[in-house]
């Protein structure tokens, strides 16, 4: 076996891609900070039970497991940073008011999520803890869209759903609640024949409402149809009102409502939003409310947030991250050394061409040169 081979769906990040990823990481983290988000850095490795407090069977299957040589306990390589940030908020910070946190780090998956997807993503995201009102969801949705616009993306489609609709329907019918997981699978897959079979012996109102969900998709006007076809329950009314406000706030993007798009239903407790762009089949960013996520750490707090994969974002982003630089000669010259140091202190990239390699400069566009004129080193256009 060749020693340079890597595992399937694992790849090195080469300079051009790494430069673009880092440019996007800095842009997004700076934008998060402008909203008041504080950065945290959870560890890549934790005890397995801490990592799997939420997310269900899917998260367990995606998590790499190994044995700690010090304690003998099972450890996990994180597959999602969100539960770790919830642990920090609930157990370490222990604040009473609103807390805004953000993060950026690697996550590992046992299996890729798509044919060409990597198993090592660079997850970046933001979370708000401590506010149950829709205002927090509106801020997170706006921040997610800001992040995508900062990456140069256009023609964004925002899909909206709400976990509260299905939860309210199941809560009013114990027989339906017993089939909750099967109903969730049928709705998520838009499997209408299976949905008809699962609801065949349910009450007429519950059956009609559940069977209506796969057909309640489209632009924001579909919410009016949903109000007409779904039971008048406080939870459903509130969910539809929330979706209407989220749709109204999303300026400059195409908004779609899909009341059966329940991916992550077991994890979320309220509004869910997913961003797509033309030409890319999979979601580029996901977010939503998950008020119960901190419960396993002894302190359930209202929470909402979003995340995305920086490597995928860099792949589709049109921004040009190739930096400009100043080309300087290599010489044992104190004045040259002082000039180079001063330029670097001022934030310039200065590349000193090693002897015999004056023209081998792939990663930077050297648009200026440092040259000696009348005994002084000055920068000139190339």
From Swiss-Prot:
<dbReference type="GO" id="GO:0000105">
    <property type="term" value="P:L-histidine biosynthetic process"/>
</dbReference>
<keyword id="KW-0368">Histidine biosynthesis</keyword>
<comment type="function">
    <text>Required for the first step of histidine biosynthesis. May allow the feedback regulation of ATP phosphoribosyltransferase activity by histidine.</text>
</comment>
<dbReference type="GO" id="GO:0005737">
    <property type="term" value="C:cytoplasm"/>
</dbReference>
<dbReference type="GO" id="GO:0004821">
    <property type="term" value="F:histidine-tRNA ligase activity"/>
</dbReference>
<dbReference type="InterPro" id="IPR004517">
    <property type="entry name" value="HisZ"/>
</dbReference>
<dbReference type="Pfam" id="PF13393">
    <property type="entry name" value="tRNA-synt_His"/>
</dbReference>
<dbReference type="InterPro" id="IPR041715">
    <property type="entry name" value="HisRS-like_core"/>
</dbReference>
<keyword id="KW-0963">Cytoplasm</keyword>
<protein>
    <recommendedName>
        <fullName>ATP phosphoribosyltransferase regulatory subunit</fullName>
    </recommendedName>
</protein>
<dbReference type="InterPro" id="IPR045864">
    <property type="entry name" value="aa-tRNA-synth_II/BPL/LPL"/>
</dbReference>
<comment type="pathway">
    <text>Amino-acid biosynthesis; L-histidine biosynthesis; L-histidine from 5-phospho-alpha-D-ribose 1-diphosphate: step 1/9.</text>
</comment>
<comment type="similarity">
    <text>Belongs to the class-II aminoacyl-tRNA synthetase family. HisZ subfamily.</text>
</comment>
<dbReference type="GO" id="GO:0006427">
    <property type="term" value="P:histidyl-tRNA aminoacylation"/>
</dbReference>
<comment type="subunit">
    <text>Heteromultimer composed of HisG and HisZ subunits.</text>
</comment>
<keyword id="KW-0028">Amino-acid biosynthesis</keyword>
<dbReference type="InterPro" id="IPR004516">
    <property type="entry name" value="HisRS/HisZ"/>
</dbReference>
């Amino acid at each position: 076996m060749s020693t340079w081979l890597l595992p399937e769906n694992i790849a090195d990040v080469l300079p051009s891609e790494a430069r673009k990823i880092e440019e996007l990481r800095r842009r997004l983290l700076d934008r998060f900070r402008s909203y008041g988000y504080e950065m945290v850095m959870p560890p890549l490795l934790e005890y397995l039970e801490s990592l799997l407090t939420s997310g269900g069977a899917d998260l367990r299957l995606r998590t790499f497991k190994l044995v700690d040589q010090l304690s003998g306990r099972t450890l996990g390589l994180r597959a999602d940073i969100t539960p770790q940030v919830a642990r920090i908020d609930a157990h370490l910070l222990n604040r009473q008011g609103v807390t805004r946190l953000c993060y950026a780090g690697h996550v590992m998956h046992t299996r890729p999520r798509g044919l060409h997807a990597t198993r090592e993503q660079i997850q970046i995201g933001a979370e708000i803890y401590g506010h149950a009102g829709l205002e927090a969801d509106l801020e997170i949705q706006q921040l997610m869209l800001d992040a995508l616009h900062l990456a140069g993306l256009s023609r964004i489609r925002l899909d909206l759903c709400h976990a509260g609709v299905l939860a309210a329907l199941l809560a009013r019918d114990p027989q339906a609640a017993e089939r909750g997981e099967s109903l969730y699978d049928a709705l998520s897959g838009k499997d209408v024949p299976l949905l008809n079979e699962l609801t065949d012996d349910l009450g007429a109102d519950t059956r009609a409402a559940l069977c209506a969900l796969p057909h309640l998709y489209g632009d924001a006007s579909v919410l009016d149809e949903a109000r007409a076809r779904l039971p008048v329950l406080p939870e459903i009314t509130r969910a539809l009102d929330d979706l209407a406000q989220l749709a109204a706030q999303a300026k400059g993007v195409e908004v779609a409502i899909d009341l059966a798009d329940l991916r992550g239903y077991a994890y979320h407790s309220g509004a869910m939003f997913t961003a797509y762009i033309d030409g890319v089949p999979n979601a580029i960013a996901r977010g939503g409310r998950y008020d119960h996520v901190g419960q396993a750490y002894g302190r359930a707090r209202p929470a909402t947030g979003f995340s995305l994969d920086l490597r995928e974002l860099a792949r589709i982003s049109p921004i040009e991250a190739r930096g400009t630089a100043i080309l300087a000669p290599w010489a044992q010259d104190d004045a040259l050394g002082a000039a180079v140091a001063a330029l670097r202190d001022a934030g310039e990239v200065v590349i000193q061409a090693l002897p015999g390699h004056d023209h081998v400069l792939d990663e930077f566009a050297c648009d200026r040169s440092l040259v000696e004129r009348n005994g002084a080193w000055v920068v000139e256009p190339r």
